[in-house]
Amino acid sequence: MFVRNALVVTGLLAALTQAAPAERNTSRHKLTVYWGAEDDTTTLDDVCNDSSYDVVNLAFLSHFFSGGGYPRMSIGNLDGPSRAQKKAGATGLQDGSSLVKSIKNCQSKGKPVILSMGGATDYSDVQLHSDAQGQQIANTVWDLFLGGTDHKELRPFGDVKLDGVDLDNETNDGTGYLAMAKQFKANFQKDTSKKYYITAAPQCPYPDQSEPLDVCRLLDWVQVQFYNNGNCNIAQSGFATAVKNWSRGIGSGVQLYIGALASGADGDEGYVDAAVLNRAIDQVKAMDLPNFGGAMLWEAQLAVNNGNYQKEIKANL
């Protein structure tokens, strides 16, 4: 959401220089960010070129079932469905060709671009009613955004393969999500040309009914929303306990990220300034957790508008 190879053969140094741009961060802890839910004054290229960030989550695939039974996208200011999408009745999909170069730019810098599915319930509908629906969505998203080969003409980003999916289910119902996660992981094995990731963004009250622990334990990392949730918010009395519970509950093989608001301007509850967040991150570091991975910010545009909030956070990671 990472790159971890060391080469010692002298003859490969020139190739390494080309493959690993100077832009790339080398800190052990990572910073992930959501992009696409606000206006696009801060472009995807801006985010990709910002050395603060290691992973970009595209927000959002907001509905699992929309026009023609296909998902609905609500990412940035795209131009509506393509001709082929309209013909198929997939009116919730978007022509994402304007983002293709930016996605490739991010990927060329070693920064995964991940499709986040869900969001707040007044904005999205990612509730499933059966395991079969979960498997269906995993296969549909695999074909439309990842390494699948069916429905090529409907792919929003053409032949570009995104790097994975993020589960942001806030419905308080995890039905079908375990089956969906397992199907995604099975599909990932079909394409050995690249690494795919599956992540989640549960709420901090532990455990989260929307993102059950049996799902979270299958993932690459979990970026817990320590905001909008009262006592377990950052700098609140229940924060440390929630962090420890999540770390233990997801298991040492799944990385834990501390999710935070990059601004208080969006009406969400629980924003803290950069100094307070950095103290909270230092508190987590001192816990010496085996799976602490870094931090997550909501959202890229909000961070820029808040004095480039992300730079202070990355500097502390």
Swiss-Prot record:
InterPro entries: Cts1-like (IPR045321), Glyco_hydro18_cat (IPR001223), Glyco_hydro_18_chit_AS (IPR001579), Glycoside_hydrolase_SF (IPR017853), Glycosyl_Hydrlase18_Chitinase (IPR050542). Glycans are attached at residues 25, 49, 169, 245. GO terms for molecular function: chitin binding; endochitinase activity. The keyword Secreted applies. The active site is at residue 170. It comes from the Eukaryota. One of its GO terms (biological process) is polysaccharide catabolic process. It is found in: Secreted. Belongs to the glycosyl hydrolase 18 family. Chitinase class III subfamily. This is Endochitinase 3. It comes from Metarhizium robertsii (strain ARSEF 23 / ATCC MYA-3075). The lineage of its organism: Eukaryota, Fungi, Dikarya, Ascomycota, Pezizomycotina.
